[in-house]
Amino acid sequence: MINSNMTETKIESNIILIYISAPNQDEATSIAKTLVDEELCACVSIIPSVRSIYKFKGQVHDENEVMLLVKTTSQLFTTLKEKVTEIHSYELPEIIATKVVYGNENYINWVNQTVRS
């Protein structure tokens, strides 16, 4: 429940959240460290176990995967996507983004200051 004394502030944001699935923890960690090291994102949260059910090349797959939640700016999406495609083991890696509309202003500022310009 939201406290009636609290106000919700919508701030303009160029921050996006990118979802990237990986086949295992080692690859997820490697991708995350590369993206942070190259300043393509400010932070990657790794969710160690997700179950993905999908159809690929005519077959239904049921796989355990690791999910990366990448915090970056919309300006870096294309460069980040190209880097992930280059280093990812999947033929067709999941790289999808959603825009952050609401957020902690200090966190949004931190993301912008942390990634490359």
From Swiss-Prot:
Pfam families, sorted: CutA1
The protein's name in its UniProt record: Divalent-cation tolerance protein cutA homolog
Quaternary context: Homotrimer.
Lineage: Eukaryota, Sar, Alveolata, Apicomplexa, Conoidasida
GO process annotations (BP): response to metal ion
Organism: Cryptosporidium parvum (strain Iowa II)
Entries under Gene3D superfamilies matching the protein: 3.30.70.120
Family, similarity comment: Belongs to the CutA family.
InterPro entries per record: Ion_tolerance_CutA, N-reg_PII-like_a/b, N-reg_PII/ATP_PRibTrfase_C
Molecular function, one GO term: copper ion binding
SUPFAM superfamilies membership: GlnB-like (SSF54913)
Classification via PANTHER family: DIVALENT CATION TOLERANCE CUTA-RELATED (PTHR23419), FI09726P (PTHR23419:SF8)
